[in-house]
Amino acid sequence: MTMKIFNVMSVVLVLLSGISTGVGADPLDTLMKKFEEGKYSKKGADTCIMCHKRSDKVMAIFDSVHGQANSKSPMAGLQCEACHGPQGKHKGKNEPMVTFGESSPLTAEMQNSVCTACHNDTSRVAWHTSLHAEQDVSCVSCHQLHVTKDPVLVKDQLVEVCSECHISAKADMNKRSSHPLKWGDMTCSDCHNPHGSMSDSALNEIDVNQTCFECHAEKRGPFLWEHAPVMENCANCHDAHGSVNEALLKSRVPMLCKQCHANDGHAGTAPGDNSSIQTGGQGCLNCHGQIHGSNHPSGKAFQF
């Protein structure tokens, strides 16, 4: 725990030291000086509680994981000051301190450095190159600290937290066909790592297909006859977050199929027959039922 506290203060000091003077710099300069002096309260959290006990939001920390009396909690070390910085000379609202949220004098990167000094396991190793970090999203943009249950860690509340920013994805999951997120059978984190990953779109797996195969294993193969678009990317045909078409398809069959298979005639279609996609009554899947791949003797026709 001592090493974690040292890491927190070291990271914050480095970030603060890079701040240039200018508008709003004075509080940060004062805060950096407090870190350099390292004057922490002699009574720890007891000093803070003397005034802040009137605030339910502050006292709720003791119902959260951060307020538990164990070796992994800030309460085992510098307590409140482990996150909020040294407050040995705290004189009320005018005294600069490490705070979190939009009203904080610290940038999102500085705020996050306090959290990542302790929360630095392998699931967060790609945070600094993640889209969230690049967009200056802070940890508290998603997480709530002084609460018994952080909503983002509760399965049936996670989707709502993500949807506050990802509005288009929320709209998609209410379309005709979608993954069962709105019923609580899935969450966004089943496919995505919000803390970043080495894959596109912060996927948990190496690519789109491997992510899909985690649930749709029957589509993985290997197949004797493979369908190239399927093996390349499931997203060639499907909208993962939802679609107005059945089976999450980007467009209806046969229009979807015709994007690759040009309308230049088809075996078994008599000359003069109506070959229109819209009015010809074409149904590709009537014959080509194993479109994800097949081991059937019919070969690349992908039949049953």
Where are these regions (language model features)?
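Positively charged n-region of N-terminal signal peptides that target proteins for export
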Residues: 1-8
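Bacterial N-terminal signal peptides
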Residues: 9-18
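Short sequence/structural segments immediately N-terminal
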Residues: 22-304
